[in-house]
From Swiss-Prot:
Glutamine amidotransferase type-2 domain location: 2-218
Keywords annotated in UniProt: Aminotransferase, Cytoplasm, Glutamine amidotransferase, Repeat, Transferase
SIS domain residues: 284-423, 453-591
Organism: Staphylococcus aureus (strain Mu50 / ATCC 700699)
EC number: 2.6.1.16
Keyword Transferase in record: yes
An example Gene Ontology biological process: carbohydrate metabolic process
Active site: C2, K596
Protein name (database record): Glutamine--fructose-6-phosphate aminotransferase [isomerizing]
HAMAP family named in the record: GlmS
Subcellular location: Cytoplasm
Length: 601
């Protein structure tokens, strides 16, 4: 949620900042702004709405300079409007600030220090910049004032501060909110995501919580909470900038759906040794083997992937597994086993709720593993181990290829642990994943069929239901989520057997019901559920699998191993959801009110 960019160097900053913000659009936002500094002045450009609107305003001015900060805002305090947009300035105009996060004690700070100050916005961010002015007026240097203010803040924040009287510096701090430092020859940058500033550098340094960073064009000084200078090595962000472009596709979501076969092949390659055997770091395997119970912590689509992963971990590896919604777990931790292993699943590696759980489990001394798409992310750094998805940048808000990558990696982990436990495998996983790859390609090739299904079943509806049994039920939850988040159709996923316990009361003439029928042992049962809803007027869309199909099924996916069907059937649901949204003329990649990376609790 939200995004920050900053540049200080020898070049004009305005265009670099605008391009950087465009690379952060996927994170979700409702307004955007930049502040640019030159020898004469600090000028702020900001607008409600899309960055394209901000660009019009910024491009209408010739003002530019070699220093600047930028921000995309997702409203948390105050409605989306011009006044609440970032950057914010202090009353005297000297200090300019961008901020991601939520300050929990801003009202207390406002009451204690800023009585009589006139505020323009309703935001917690303006309180921060006014506090910097307040302490500066008490005789503190800008660094001292900034450090003092940061010490008073309770909550999450990533901050970038400009001082009109010290035009050669950006002051930076973070806590529980992502922010990176990019380094170059004669310039330095800050960014919420390395993707934003790949246009100028691929070399980055991590910023840790509670650190203060003084950024100049030719040097960077990192200080810990006690004021001690910290030396930190840089790393190269191994991201191909072209991977983050739409190319020939109309939308990022469609591109990312089409990329799933390539992602499957990459995962097979990355998790295979020279002899063609599955491989994962032995320390990870040992921690899984030693665990008496696995607790999967995730949110949204990653939570749904965790539900599928539970099937692998229990059925193949023989490890009891629980899957928890991160935002609930952090406030209502269950009674834990004696030797738990916590597995955190997050595409971005920055999910705030999951990170909050990780902080607590680290305090308890429990082992942890992060499964993420982003090397060097917060969850990756703070967990004991990391397994990477190797899916490439996922830009569309609605996750597609990360979901299938998460399931594939969980299947590989489970099979290796099963082998270590001496449990006889009933599957040649590499061979079966290759079949999955071919099956996904076949479904992608059938995109026109999926578009017709979307037209036939979802063109005018306001409600839709997804049903399945056993592992199909887990996929039905993801299918419903995909549809609702991009088409705004009220969609819900249910276990087929639960229909008669309340949900069937919602079935009316023409109500679309998408039924997944890919599991042999419950095939008759789910088809019985379909008959129940048809008897009440439902319009059934049955997605089955070769070998289990019946006459009249809407679509039949290629045959794959039953436990791997989620990797295949979900692709059909992704495409159906995509076309349902497309036909409603909606913004598929950036649905309303949603953010790609939820970095506040």
């Amino acid at each position: 949620m939200c995004g920050i960019v900053g540049y200080i160097g020898y070049d004009n900053a305005k265009e670099l900042l605008l391009k950087g913000l465009e690379k952060l659009e996927y994170r979700g936002y409702d307004s955007a702004g930049i502040a640019v500094v030159n020898d004469d002045n600090t000028t702020v450009f900001k607008e409600k709405g899309r960055i394209a609107e901000l660009r019009k305003v910024a491009d209408s001015s010739d003002f530019d300079g070699p220093v600047g900060i930028g921000h995309t805002r997702w409203a948390t305090h105050g409605v989306p409007n011009h006044e609440n947009s970032h950057p914010h300035q202090s009353s005297n105009g000297r200090f300019t600030l961008v901020h991601n996060g939520v300050i929990e004690n801003y009202e207390e700070l406002k009451g204690e220090y800023l009585q009589g100050v006139s505020f323009i916005s309703e935001t917690d961010t303006e309180v921060i910049v006014q506090l910097v002015e307040y302490f500066s007026n008490q005789g503190l240097s800008t660094e001292e004032a900034f450090t003092k203010v940061v010490s008073l803040l309770h909550g999450s924040y990533a901050l970038g501060l400009l001082d009109a009287e010290d035009k050669d510096t950006i002051y930076v701090a973070k806590n529980k909110s992502p922010l990176l430092l990019g380094v170059g020859e004669g310039f330095n940058v800050i960014a919420s995501d390395a993707l934003a500033m790949l246009q100028v550098t691929s070399e980055y340094k991590e910023i840790h919580d509670h650190e203060i960073v003084i950024v100049k064009k030719d040097e960077v000084i990192i200080k810990d909470a006690d004021g001690n200078v910290v030396e930190r090595d840089s790393y190269i962000a191994e991201i191909d900038a072209s991977d983050a472009e739409k190319g020939v596709y109309a939308h990022y979501m469609l591109k990312e759906i089409h990329e799933q076969p390539a992602v499957m092949r990459r995962i097979i390659q990355e998790y295979q040794d020279a002899e063609g055997n599955l491989k994962i770091d032995q320390d990870i395997i040992n921690d899984v083997k030693e665990a008496d119970r696995i607790y999967v912590i995730a949110a949204g689509t990653s939570y749904h992937a965790g539900l599928v992963g539970k099937e692998f971990l229990e059925k193949w590896a023989g490890v009891p597994t629980e899957v928890h919604v991160a935002s609930e777990f952090v406030y209502n931790m269950p009674l834990l086993s004696e030797k738990p292993l916590f597995v955190y699943i997050s595409q971005s590696g920055e999910t705030a709720d999951s990170r909050a759980v990780l902080v607590e489990t680290n305090k308890l001394g429990h082992k942890s593993l992060t499964i993420t798409n982003v090397a060097g992310s917060t969850l990756s750094r703070e967990a004991d181990h990391t397994l990477l998805l190797h899916a490439g940048p996922e830009i569309a808000v609605a996750s597609t290829k990360a979901y299938t990558a998460q399931i594939a990696v969980l299947s590989i982990l489970s099979q290796i642990v099963a082998k270590e436990h001496g449990r006889e495998a009933d599957i040649d996983l590499l061979r079966e994943l290759a079949k999955v790859t071919t099956a996904i390609e076949a479904i992608v090739d059938d995109a026109p069929i999926m578009e017709q299904i979307a037209t036939d079943f979802l063109e005018t509806t306001r409600n839709a239901f997804f049903i399945g049994r056993t592992i199909d039920y887990n996929v039905s939850l993801e299918g419903a989520l995909k549809l609702k988040e991009i088409s705004y159709i009220q969609a819900e996923g249910f276990a087929g057997g639960e229909l008669k316990h309340g949900t069937i009361a919602l079935i009316e003439d023409g109500t679309p019901v998408v039924a997944l029928a890919t599991q042999e042992n419950v095939n008759l049962s789910i088809r019985g559920n379909v008959k129940e809803v048809v008897a009440r007027g439902a319009h059934p869309c049955i997605i089955s699998m070769e070998g289990l199909e019946k006459e009249g099924d809407t679509y039949v996916i290629p045959h794959v191993h039953e436990l791997l069907t989620p990797l295949v059937s979900v692709v059909a649901l992704q495409l159906i959801s995509y076309y349902a949204a497309l036909h409603r003329d909606l913004d598929v990649d950036k649905p309303r009110n949603l953010a790609k990376s939820v970095t506040v609790e």
